[in-house]
From Swiss-Prot:
GO terms for biological process: tRNA processing. GO terms for cellular component: cytoplasm. The keyword Nuclease does not apply. This is tRNA1(Val) (adenine(37)-N6)-methyltransferase.
């Protein structure tokens, strides 16, 4: 359903995955302010790209395979204040990698598919958006390694299990995790999501630390209200904050 933010509007009626707290959290958390060229992998309705456009002066390239989602995405781009900085390409990231200039993006954002060989969704569109069948972690990391500049960063959000699986594959792609945030939906509950900040390995990779800083974030307090930390992150976007 259509969703209005403070500076832009999202129509996601044709998109397999609607606007979600995961997407808003990632778009608000990713360190984008100094970025010049941003890549949004699996753009969906364009939420992350639009948040990135609001938070930076970067040129943003959005990749979306599904034609219906791409229609929503392009419409949302056209109606935004930043349409001249937003470019949508309707293709897979695998196809994009065959023609794109290597190491040309200083930030990559992605809210990846996160069901791996699990039960398929009732909606075919939703299934494509949520399953790793169309984009495995190996393919995602291959793309990040190929397209990210040497000093660049990639920001992702995944369920805990998926995040741990992805972290185990970083080394083989010459990538490393600089920071992770464990996200709990409600105070007192176990974290169920993880934000990851990934960078290329330095030349002295063998001497790099194998651990990374981990912090915690709670979305809602026990009384059901948004936490102060979440409000601080998202207040530039949500109308009622």
């Amino acid at each position: 359903m259509p969703f209005s933010f403070k500076q832009f509007h999202i129509d996601d009626r044709r998109c397999g995955m609607p606007v979600s707290t995961d997407g808003v959290l990632l778009g608000a958390w990713a360190p984008l302010s100094n970025s010049k060229n941003i890549l949004d992998i699996g753009a969906g309705s364009g939420l992350l790209s639009l948040m990135a456009a609001q938070r930076s002066k970067a040129n943003i390239t959005a990749i979306e395979l599904d034609e219906n989602a791409a229609l929503d995405c392009q419409s949302n781009f056209n109606l935004s204040p930043w349409s001249k900085r937003l470019t949508l390409l309707t293709r897979s990231i695998q196809q994009f990698c065959t023609t794109a200039k290597k190491h040309s993006f200083d930030h990559i954002i992605c809210n990846p598919p996160y069901f791996d060989n699990g039960p398929q969704s009732n909606s075919a569109l939703r299934a494509t958006a949520r399953h790793t069948d169309s984009l495995s972690f190996d393919e995602l990391l291959t793309a990040i390694s190929s397209l990210l500049s040497p000093a660049g960063q990639a920001s992702l959000i995944l369920p805990i299990t998926g995040a741990n699986q992805l972290l185990q594959q970083l080394e083989q792609h010459q990538l490393t995790c600089q920071h992770a945030v464990l996200v709990a939906s409600v105070e007192g509950k176990k974290p169920n999501r993880q934000l990851l900040l990934i960078t290329p390995c330095r030349s002295n990779f063998a001497n790099q630390a194998t651990t990374h800083p981990v912090s915690n974030l709670v979305i809602r307090n026990t009384d059901g209200h948004y936490s102060d930390d979440f409000i601080l992150l998202s207040k530039s976007f949500y109308l009622k904050l």
